Amino acid sequence: MTDKRKDGSGKLLYCSFCGKSQHEVRKLIAGPSVYICDECVDLCNDIIREEIKEVAPHRERSALPTPHEIRIHLDDYVIGQEQAKKVLAVAVYNHYKRLRNGDTSNGVELGKSNILLIGPTGSGKTLLAETLARLLDVPFTMADATTLTEAGYVGEDVENIIQKLLQKCDYDVQKAQRGIVYIDEIDKISRKSDNPSITRDVSGEGVQQALLKLIEGTVAAVPPQGGRKHPQQEFLQVDTSKILFICGGAFAGLDKVIANRVETGSGIGFGATVKAKSDKASEGELLSQVEPEDLIKFGLIPEFIGRLPVVATLNELSEEALIQILKEPKNALTKQYQALFNLEGVDLEFRDEALDAIARKAMARKTGARGLRSIVEAALLDTMYDLPSMEDVEKVVIDESVIDGQSKPLLIYGKPEAQASGE
């Protein structure tokens, strides 16, 4: 039997690299007088991939931004919270400098500086952590502390956090060990009182105990597929001492704990300083004075607090800050919706009074920056529903009355005779 190509010639083709014939492989790719089979292509890909892995750590070593550069990058995406940005910039820089130079410097062992972010909802805690990970080009994952339980109980094991991080970097252990983990709602795992409980608290103090070693640094055995359902599979060994943990929470009521401590320490009698009610510190001012003893009273155990030596407090966003958030960051909400409307070939304009109205509504809801999107979405819903079916619309204008629900957006048409209001 004669082997023939589709073009009718009787020549049998062979891979120029491994020598296999066209019938021994699935695919043979032709070049100028040379051929390569699919098996050799796969082998080349594997070789290149391994070389990239070896080169990547050297590239990362030379790419560590300074605290000033980190702060400038955060300014592009996060409005306000200047002190928190400075604290985060220094802590993150020191953490990755420690990784780059090893755990010791001149015989001195460098400790790990995990971070605790304290601030009201919608103040930018999650956004700060996400922006840092994006700047440093490291794997990033978020975990909700309220879903975690002690091992052996219904809920997520704390090791599942590391498993999620591995998923983000395609189970590359070396890459995962340079990652950032953000644990949200950390205040929700506080114990019910500051006295040790005689009953088992599997979702509060129990989770704090389970997180201790993970945050401080241990070699966690993580199943590649996660969970507790595959006990026989080979486990991945991940050194968590190289992972930066950032914990965040609103800590509602912590300001009262701090106020009680501050007022108690102010003294009584003839030498005491008498303060008028108007002199009472704001929530942000009180949170900036937080001490470990306040967090213990709130319900965090001392050992857990000790693993989070860097504390940054975030202030509640003012109306002016919310207006800035709407229009100034690189991925500002108004810019996102304008880009969305541009895909339909329509310009979207937010007038200044509309931005003021959005900020006022968000302040009234006490949801911070998180509530801005829902307000804008509600105002634009009908327009986004109708716009794809409409013709000749060139521009949509949003003013204060639209945000307040008193009128519909103004639609400006391309043809002057067809110009009309959406009312």
UniProtKB/Swiss-Prot annotation:
SUPFAM superfamilies: Glucocorticoid receptor-like (DNA-binding domain), P-loop containing nucleoside triphosphate hydrolases. GO terms for molecular function: ATP binding; ATP hydrolysis activity; ATP-dependent protein folding chaperone; protein dimerization activity; unfolded protein binding; zinc ion binding. One of its GO terms (biological process) is proteolysis involved in protein catabolic process. Residues 2-56 form the ClpX-type ZB domain. Gene3D superfamilies: 1.10.8.60, ClpX chaperone, C4-type zinc finger domain, P-loop containing nucleotide triphosphate hydrolases. InterPro entries: AAA+_ATPase, ATP-dep_Clp_protease_ClpX, ATPase_AAA_core, Clp_ATPase_C, Clp_protease_ATP-bd_su_ClpX, ClpX_bact, P-loop_NTPase, Znf_CppX_C4. Zn(2+) binds at C15, C18, C37, C40. One of its GO terms (cellular component) is HslUV protease complex. ATP binds at P120, T121, G122, S123, G124, K125, T126, L127. It holds the Pfam family zf-C4_ClpX. Disulfide bonds: none annotated. Keywords: ATP-binding, Chaperone, Metal-binding, Nucleotide-binding, Zinc. Belongs to the ClpX chaperone family. Component of the ClpX-ClpP complex. Forms a hexameric ring that, in the presence of ATP, binds to fourteen ClpP subunits assembled into a disk-like structure with a central cavity, resembling the structure of eukaryotic proteasomes. ATP-dependent specificity component of the Clp protease. It directs the protease to specific substrates. Can perform chaperone functions in the absence of ClpP. NCBIfam families: clpX (TIGR00382), PRK05342.1 (NF003745). This is ATP-dependent Clp protease ATP-binding subunit ClpX.
